[in-house]
Amino acid sequence: MKTVRLRAAAKINLYLEILGVRPDNFHELVMVLQSVDLADTVTLRAAPTTRVSCSHPLVPNDRTNLAVRAVEVLQKHTGIDEGVEIVIEKRIPVASGLAGGSTDAAAVLAGLNVLWDLGLTQRQLQSLGAQIGSDIPFCVTGGTALAMGRGEVLSPLPALKGVYLVLAKLADLQVSTAWAYQTYRREYLSEGTAPRARTSALLSAVASQEVARIAPLLHNDLERAVLPAYPQVSALREHLVSAGALGAMMSGSGPAVFGLARDRAHAEAVCAVLAGEPGLELFVCKTQQAGILMEESESSDL
């Protein structure tokens, strides 16, 4: 039996601006996205029918799981009716703004491309992923990218290599992505907004590879919706700054926040300051230039 095992990287937003509402009711976005080395492990094995298992109680095992949707999209595209067993080992916090569900789905697309010997290109996998969720095309490739449209129109940026950060999330808190966007739309969105000058400033800072230039330019429109409703997220963001982070921001729709650091030692020092807080998930992470990494592909007669 053939087995494929992959590492599916988390994503952070260095920039997220909501420009307006599209005719298809999605939001028009400008984002700068970055993969980090916090990752789930996704294992795929041939099976008569598709099933998914995960030890995390909040991860569904039905077709509401984007990983199952990824199988269905590939089956429809290729005409293959085989099933697959999907085992997800979660390290990325669930419902946290780190694209955990999307990156698992991206791993399923990439893994089935190997398991079923499909020969699809990365661009084809991205196009299929866009049918499932807006973050999935980025998760397929990973790295550092400018994302526009609803997030699926990607332009690679100069690789942001070896940047350390601290990810922090209150363990018992989840924020609905749909709620965050709808709240922003209702309370803050004005039609015809043009991208702010800080977009180009951040792109220049990313190209410079200087974390000290990037940190003050972090921006996320969704903080305006989420932080007033979840003051504990705002407090955690401020705690990262007071602990010494160069800059801190909520990722995506939250509630995970991250703080940028000068180097690994600095990140570990910031993490140590927060380590005593109860109910807090903390990770020292580093940027990486891949979304999905193949760990293992093997065949067995068992």
From Swiss-Prot:
UniProt KW keywords: ATP-binding, Isoprene biosynthesis, Kinase, Nucleotide-binding, Transferase
Catalytic activity, reaction form: 4-CDP-2-C-methyl-D-erythritol + ATP = 4-CDP-2-C-methyl-D-erythritol 2-phosphate + ADP + H(+)
Source taxon at top rank: Bacteria
Binding site for ATP: 93-103
EC number of this enzyme: 2.7.1.148
Single biological process term from Gene Ontology: isopentenyl diphosphate biosynthetic process, methylerythritol 4-phosphate pathway
Gene Ontology MF, one: 4-(cytidine 5'-diphospho)-2-C-methyl-D-erythritol kinase activity
Disulfide bonds: none
The protein's annotated pathway: Isoprenoid biosynthesis; isopentenyl diphosphate biosynthesis via DXP pathway; isopentenyl diphosphate from 1-deoxy-D-xylulose 5-phosphate: step 3/6
Protein name, entry field: 4-diphosphocytidyl-2-C-methyl-D-erythritol kinase
Lineage: Bacteria, Bacillati, Cyanobacteriota, Cyanophyceae, Gloeobacterales
